[in-house]
Amino acid sequence: MVYKSIFPTFVQNINLGQMTESERKQIIALIQREVIPAIGCTEPIAVALCVAKATETLGAKPEKIKVLLSANILKNAMGVGIPGTGMIGLPIAVALGALIGKSDYQLEVLKDSTPEAVEEGKKLIDEKRICISLKEDITEKLYIEVTCEAGGEQATAIISGGHTTFVYVAKGDEVLLNKQQTSGEEEEEETLELTLRKVYDFALTAPLDEIRFILETARLNKKAAEQSFQGDYGHALGKMLRGTYEHKIMGDSVFSHILSYTSAACDARMAGGMIPVMSNSGSGNQGISATLPVVVYAEENGKSEEELIRALMMSHLTVIYIKQSLGRLSALCGCVVAATGSSCGITWLMGGSYKQVAFAVQNMIANLTGMICDGAKPSCALKVTTGVSTAVLSAVMAMENRCVTSVEGIIDEDVDQSIRNLTRIGSQGMNETDRVVLDIMTHKGC
């Protein structure tokens, strides 16, 4: 689609001059760290990345690979497809990380995979050279420890706190990196305190050339959806929503297109399609959910390129803001957070002010808080679709100046406090839920 190049002035409801150049640059750097390409579900891919680093450090093909994981990593990697393999789960991701993985590729670590490598990986698995187990007595929800052995030597790599954050690398007794006492990435993020108001003002006032890069999320994630329409991935929810049922029940509408595009990209990703997407805060599904509803709404309503850029920036930065206090992994489904971002972007594209964007956030929190994460898997497309449908509903309510009030449930008069209530439930209140979910998943008779 060709976007209009002329954009009307929109200075009302913006705290002009409140943000320093240094703070603006910090925010841009934060977004560039958090919004990056990924192929495949980021938890098994992060494990493959850690294996690749340990293998590179060892300097030889491993004869044995020992992997220790936090419960949340284990949960998110059990039932998801691994790109280019036609297989599900961690063992093949570990094997390919050792055989063809390149740590420089980050979350695209397996993009050089070939059918021959997959066959070789199957042999490693069959020969029982890979051992995967739960890391006991740790508080980190995102923790990956890999030790590779060959010829009497060994190398270890540890990722903690972020999907690409290496905190420890060693070969034998030689320690090459040790940041285990402090997580550099988390410290860096904590120095930048965001609020919804700050997110809104940044998205609408940042120089366009400094934030134009966010358009890559639209290109990559829309392409993923379009590729999914041509295939048969996962539960094929996105493809199904473009067929007979879409027209009979929902009509050929912006709403139905938002659902089909978003779920299609998720279908392909969770089924293990070798299709890159732009992730947000370590999650491809969050990147998809923060991007495609905004893109589809903008395109089908004739919005300008600048409007799309600013709406995408508002959406993605809202997700990053909420994830700062929620954490990378939790018992709370990430689509709750990501769809909240897209609801903000859509509300603004509808002509909403800051007040109405805040209303949309309140409506989202009142509706979806508590949706559990029971691992990454093809049925995530269903949850993503639930999230983005609620995002549209919340935006429509906000534009009618309808908002869940502070006497209702966990909603506070202050939208930022409501966000903190959401993340407190997800990071503290649902810890036992997380444990029970993993227990159920690991004791099923399948």
Report residues per predicted region.
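Conserved phosphate/anionic-ligand binding catalytic regions in large, soluble enzymes, centered on
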Residues: 37-53, 275-292, 333-337
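Early transmembrane hairpin of solute transport permeases
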Residues: 48-138, 144-145
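Internal helix-turn-beta structural module
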Residues: 360-446
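Acidic-glycine-rich active-site phosphate/pyrophosphate-binding loop
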Residues: 17-28, 60-73, 253-272, 304-322, ...
